[in-house]
Amino acid sequence: MSKEKFERTKPHVNVGTIGHVDHGKTTLTAAITTVLAKTYGGSARAFDQIDNAPEEKARGITINTSHVEYDTPSRHYAHVDCPGHADYVKNMITGAAQMDGAILVVAATDGPMPQTREHILLGRQVGVPYMIVFMNKCDMVDDEELLELVEMEVRELLSAYDFPGDDIPVVKGSALKALEGVKEWEDKIIELAGYLDTYIPEPERAVDKPFLLPIEDVFSISGRGTVVTGRVERGIVKVGEEVEIVGIKDTVKSTCTGVEMFRKLLDEGRAGENVGVLLRGIKREDIERGQVLAKPGSIKPHTTFESEVYILSKDEGGRHTPFFKGYRPQFYFRTTDVTGTIELPEGVEMVMPGDNINMVVTLIHPIAMDDGLRFAIREGGRTVGAGVVAKVIA
């Protein structure tokens, strides 16, 4: 059997399984790869291949994550599954595996449990845009009314966290029976795949979003002007277009008079490329690392935001002691550290290493940000936590 060529023609969508421990997330992941491979071609992955997840580093944090891939006739999916609850928390907060949609696995035998709730809340905070529910272990429940009750509970829970609970697709299945090849349960996996295809819209590609380039370096070229360098995060910048310099200082407008890559002149710079952008009428000292170059009006500078944060444990190289209100670490956004103060939720006196917590941060300088922006928390250059902007306040 020859290796299939990787087809770039299909839309690529990132998904993952979330939900309470032992509700069958990994079994479902194995079942999806197995049933879809059998039906549409591709390679199946066994439970134990997925379960011993390799370690990865994201923003200085070690996370165990398994990545599998599968295809439906219309799409290619990259699917992430994590072995432990802490790995999910870290994964979602660091954005190590950004999800275009998530499959929430709920055992019909248990109904929603504490981690079910926590994963839904995290999904809301970190901006997982779509959820599909897979009610697992339905082969173990004979009572149709009980199944309806569990479905109702899950829908209410999703609605409580601002997901459209009444409209979300719910598939009642059995991952284990599907893995064992029982036709009626295999059909439920095909039904789930159908919802992945139809309910999760095709994600907007980075190159189609408004232009943004985090500035890494600035230098002046005599007779030509000031050049900023960095990797284009999203969108396209064309020679002759207006851009804004946002963050740290007052926002300033300029015009891109040249784009270069590897000393060659280009007419545009695109998402993913490392480029130098020549700016008209800007002095070397007017601009610094940590600012961004962006399409005018597309992003604003902010200082205060609500965030969802994971604090590294001592074993992960984090702090050895808790911190209290009045804690003033550095917050690392894209290319620079900014000092900030924190406000803990009511009734929370201290935060222990290994905790995840919601907190309001106020920075000493404004930074260009939108909801969903990831950051690291650092003390003297050492990462002690990771976070995501849940909601910009001011």
UniProtKB/Swiss-Prot annotation:
Keywords: Cytoplasm, Elongation factor, GTP-binding, Hydrolase, Magnesium, Metal-binding, Nucleotide-binding, Protein biosynthesis. GO terms for molecular function: GTP binding; GTPase activity; guanosine tetraphosphate binding; translation elongation factor activity. Residues 10-204 form the tr-type G domain. CDD domains: EF_Tu, EFTU_II, EFTU_III. It is an enzyme of class 3 (hydrolase). Residues 174-176 are annotated as: G5. Its EC number is 3.6.5.3. Pfam families: GTP_EFTU, GTP_EFTU_D2, GTP_EFTU_D3. GO terms for cellular component: cytosol. Residues 60-64 are annotated as: G2. It catalyses: GTP + H2O = GDP + phosphate + H(+). Residues 81-84 are annotated as: G3. GTP binds at residues 19-26, 81-85, 136-139. The keyword Transcription regulation does not apply. Residues 19-26 are annotated as: G1. Residues 136-139 are annotated as: G4. It is found in: Cytoplasm. Mg(2+) binds at T26. Belongs to the TRAFAC class translation factor GTPase superfamily. Classic translation factor GTPase family. EF-Tu/EF-1A subfamily. GTP hydrolase that promotes the GTP-dependent binding of aminoacyl-tRNA to the A-site of ribosomes during protein biosynthesis. Monomer. This is Elongation factor Tu 2. It comes from Yersinia enterocolitica serotype O:8 / biotype 1B (strain NCTC 13174 / 8081).
